[in-house]
């Protein structure tokens, strides 16, 4: 085994040991349930002033009737 190969082996070994010790320290803990729900809701909810068929799909959690550009009343997220 020459010097370059030995250096590469030591580098890989140090990386593996570093990953294992980081895992033992809790660096890879999963999200709490509430955090996961908040992230999911943010990625799937309807933003403000967008049409909303259901109140629960809005990021704010509520819809109201508002006039659109044609003067018609449509439900939009608050």
Curated annotation (Swiss-Prot):
One of its GO terms (molecular function) is toxin activity. Disulfide bonds join 45-59, 52-63, 58-77. The presence of a 'disulfide through disulfide knot' structurally defines this protein as a knottin. GO terms for cellular component: extracellular region. Belongs to the neurotoxin 08 (Shiva) family. 01 (omega toxin) subfamily. It comes from Hadronyche infensa (Fraser island funnel-web spider). Keywords: Calcium channel impairing toxin, Cleavage on pair of basic residues, Disulfide bond, Ion channel impairing toxin, Knottin, Secreted, Signal, Toxin, Voltage-gated calcium channel impairing toxin. Expressed by the venom gland. This is Omega-hexatoxin-Hi1g. Its main location: secreted. Pfam families: Omega-toxin. Residues 1-22 form the signal peptide. GO terms for biological process: defense response. It is found in: Secreted. Inhibits insect, but not mammalian, voltage-gated calcium channels (Cav). Residues 23-40 form a propeptide.
């Amino acid at each position: 085994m020459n010097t370059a190969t030995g250096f590469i082996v030591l580098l890989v070994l140090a990386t593996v040991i570093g990953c294992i010790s980081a895992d033992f320290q809790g660096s890879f803990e999963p999200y709490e349930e509430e955090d996961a729900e908040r992230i999911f809701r943010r990625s799937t909810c309807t933003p403000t002033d967008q049409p909303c068929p259901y109140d629960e799909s809005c990021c704010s959690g509520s819809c109201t009737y508002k006039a659109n550009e044609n003067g018609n009343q449509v439900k939009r997220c608050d």
